[in-house]
């Protein structure tokens, strides 16, 4: 069969499985690919369980994560699905954003109900901004008593409500193992789950539809033409002759106009999210702009020095610190393209943070950085990554 080309016609949605270890996340991922392959063979290839379980290593912000990516299609949508086998891999993925999720399937074994990691994953999903969660009650073939299933469902709904997720989210009874074995009744339930995913996870807002932002990677002067700032457009679209602001690092913002856009030495009328471009900016000297600033649509992004974040601290084995850190820890915070020193305040009741822990922290930076809630950062000491995190709240 010819390899199907990537169709742009369908909405593309990133999802993942979350939940307690051994509740069947990876089995469910394999079952979804098999059932969709059997139902729509022209749209899907099947992925074997052992391929998904041997999750390849990836690096995100200097942290190694084991994570599997599979893709599949329903009639309505194209999905990229991430599954991380180990609990630590989940936490690292959610905090570093190696694989962003537009929505998640929370897998809860009907035999156990919500467990500590179930709660932790839902809490993290809230903190890192996963927009929507629905539920697969797995191993439902092993519970004969409907009352037990109803109790588990109630517990899961309470857990979602406690973290401000939709407590009326779909809860679908499944047996991933039975569906993998081809049992028709349980196969039908997987299709029901995917119909719920199609319906309940909202279409994501694509990066091109957001306001323009480009981190500055380099600045140089072209004789006779002026100053060019280069970088990869993070979001939005920029057109020639549009006004922009350059913000961050310095006390004041700089207003200017983009008079030219270049990509691969060709002149363009516009650039969009994902493009590596050079922007020719009017009336700006080379020394007015530096790496670490961002070029933005006027009024859309502001620089800040104080924020709260959720961070994962590398273990010694991962190349992180060998010792814990305490209040007033002063590492560098690497945002987009540059390091800025910051002072860490730990939450009340937390005396120290050990390598391998994840923690909340308040940070005060010595220079302002253009940021929004949800921005990712690395924590570094002398250029070596010792942690990664995400801004959960801006304080100043």
UniProtKB/Swiss-Prot annotation:
Residues 138-141 are annotated as: G4. It comes from Rhodococcus opacus (strain B4). It is an enzyme of class 3 (hydrolase). Residues 62-66 are annotated as: G2. Monomer. The keyword Chloroplast does not apply. Residues 175-177 are annotated as: G5. Its EC number is 3.6.5.3. Belongs to the TRAFAC class translation factor GTPase superfamily. Classic translation factor GTPase family. EF-Tu/EF-1A subfamily. Mg(2+) binds at residue 26. Keywords: Cytoplasm, Elongation factor, GTP-binding, Hydrolase, Magnesium, Metal-binding, Nucleotide-binding, Protein biosynthesis. It is found in: Cytoplasm. Residues 83-86 are annotated as: G3. This is Elongation factor Tu. One of its GO terms (molecular function) is GTP binding. Residues 10-205 form the tr-type G domain. One of its GO terms (cellular component) is cytosol. The lineage of its organism: Bacteria, Bacillati, Actinomycetota, Actinomycetes, Mycobacteriales. Pfam families: GTP_EFTU, GTP_EFTU_D2, GTP_EFTU_D3. GTP hydrolase that promotes the GTP-dependent binding of aminoacyl-tRNA to the A-site of ribosomes during protein biosynthesis.
